[in-house]
Amino acid sequence: MTKIFEARVLKVGPEAAGMIKDANMLILFGEEAPEDLAEYCYKIDNKKLSGTITKGGRLLIDNQEFPITAVGAVVEKNLKNLGHITISFDGSNEGSLPGTLHVQAAKPAVLGIGSVIQLFS
């Protein structure tokens, strides 16, 4: 597999961990996250995507591996332009929302400042 994206978490909003616990999802946003969303986001340092995100690819968060099960229609565009995607740990095979990346997870990710997020296709 080829690495197509890597970012580090710069800041964790006060409600971000609660989104994982309560909604089984996390929100990534580049440094320009709108203030009203920032409290729910993991701010990341990179928006450079060098390939296509595909079903069957892999998401790695601090070496925790999650198979990609569905890719929303605007995931790549939002990641490139805003550093923004929602990652849902529900294993859905059909994208529920255009900006959501779905992954299979026995348990949701645990991440914090300095965590490394990678995508492979």
What is each model feature region?
Residues 64-65, 71-77:
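Short, conserved beta-turn/loop elements at beta-strand boundaries and strand-helix junctions
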Residues 75-86:
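Short, solvent-exposed secondary-structure boundary/capping segments
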Residues 62-63, 121:
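Conserved "cap/hinge" positions at secondary-structure junctions
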Residues 51-54, 59-60, 111:
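Short, well-ordered loop/turn sites that connect or cap secondary structure elements
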Residues 17, 28, 91-121:
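Helix-rich interaction surfaces within compact, conserved domain-sized segments
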Residues 37-48, 93-103:
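Short, structured beta-strand/loop micro-motifs enriched in basic residues and often containing a Trp
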Residues 49, 55, 75, 105-107:
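Short, conserved secondary-structure segments in the cores of folded domains
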Residues 1-40, 115-116, 121:
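N-terminal disorder-to-order initiation segments that are Gly/Lys/Arg-biased
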